[in-house]
A protein has these predicted regions:
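Cytosolic-side transmembrane-helix boundaries in multi-pass membrane proteins
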Residues: 1, 272-306
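Structural signature of hydrophobic alpha-helical transmembrane segments
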Residues: 21-33, 71-80, 166, 170-180, ...
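Loop-to-transmembrane alpha-helix initiation sites
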Residues: 99, 103, 226-233, 256, ...
Length: 306
């Protein structure tokens, strides 16, 4: 898990640079809360040796923070940490036993329970000014505009949503949405260290690209293009760091590919037809529930057996 923390450093640094001290506070509260809660639950409730040294609680804290707006109140962040660690992870017995990604369970709980705070997006404004200006995410802009009868292409042009902004960090949203380059650099590091395999991520991104291309070619006024869908929202963070969590993803390559295809398809269906502009978190959690079945269908053959 230490490698995952290292891989997340570019995203953390970029988020703090662009969202300022407010994001630093969210990160600090989230990480400290997750680590402290795991330590206390393990020692005093489970009566077991501390597991904080495996870095998994720190990873959950960082990922939870990157899934939240920079202006999220500290007490809301703490509640998210309680749900992520106390409910989604330790209730199942700790690392290796949980069915669902803890950080995403925390995020979805907060999204449902505190929608006002969870949709109070800020525009990147530097180290001291990030919490001053509110704005919509690119997906939110498109979703709201389409409901008013505008075309997707016009909305992208009118709001100056460029691919370079999405790549190099200059868009509103959760901290983890701020820069595609930062996320991808961490993903490449994990691949180089052989911490993860690329199949799940590639199947997610490939499905989103292929399916969105079909819809976009059918009606470019109502559906956004593949590149826009790949670079916006939490797709890259989710596909590179959360869908690839070895505890909550399939063990086999075939199972992982089906897992990724499901995530990509569900994400796009929620984006295009759902009430929420973003569907990555819901898609990953839904597919997390299929992992036991996928592992049963596509179990790895044991060495020495036919």
């Amino acid at each position: 898990m230490r490698d995952v923390v290292i891989a997340l450093i570019p995203a953390v640094v970029v988020s703090v640079v662009f969202y300022g001290l407010a994001e630093l506070l969210v990160l600090a509260v989230s990480v400290i809360s997750c680590v402290a809660l795991e330590y206390l639950i393990t020692k005093y409730l489970l009566k077991a040796p501390s597991t904080v040294g495996d870095w998994s609680a720190a990873v959950t804290g960082i990922l939870l923070a990157l899934n939240l707006p920079a202006t999220t109140p500290w007490w809301v962040v703490f509640i998210g940490a309680v749900v992520a660690i106390g409910v989604a992870k330790m209730t199942f017995g700790g690392l290796g036993q949980n069915v669902f990604n803890p950080a995403l369970v925390g995020r979805v709980f907060l999204l449902i329970s505190f929608p006002t705070y969870m949709t109070n997006w800020t525009i990147p404004g530097g180290l001291f000014g990030a919490d001053a200006i509110s704005g919509a995410t690119p997906l939110g802009i498109i979703n709201e505009g389409l409901m008013k009868g505008a075309s997707a292409a016009d909305l992208i042009a009118q709001n100056g949503l460029t691919y370079s902004q999405m790549l190099f960090a200059n868009i509103g949203g959760s901290a983890g949405e701020v820069s595609a380059i930062a996320i991808l650099s961490g993903f490449i590091y994990l691949l180089a260290r052989k911490v993860i395999k690329p199949w799940i991520t590639l199947s997610i991104l490939g499905t989103v690209a292929a399916v969105s291309c079909v819809f976009w070619l059918a009606d470019p006024t109502q559906f956004t293009d593949p590149v826009f869908n790949l670079l916006t929202g939490g797709l890259l963070l989710g596909s590179c760091f959360m869908a690839t969590d070895y505890v909550t993803s399939p063990m086999s390559t075939k199972g992982g590919i089906i897992f990724g295809i499901g995530i990509g398809f569900i994400t796009l269906m929620i984006r295009y037809f759902g009430s929420y502009p973003e569907g990555v978190s819901f898609a990953i959690l839904i597919m997390n529930s299929t992992v036991p079945l996928l592992n049963k269908w596509f179990h790895q053959k044991k060495y020495g057996r036919a």
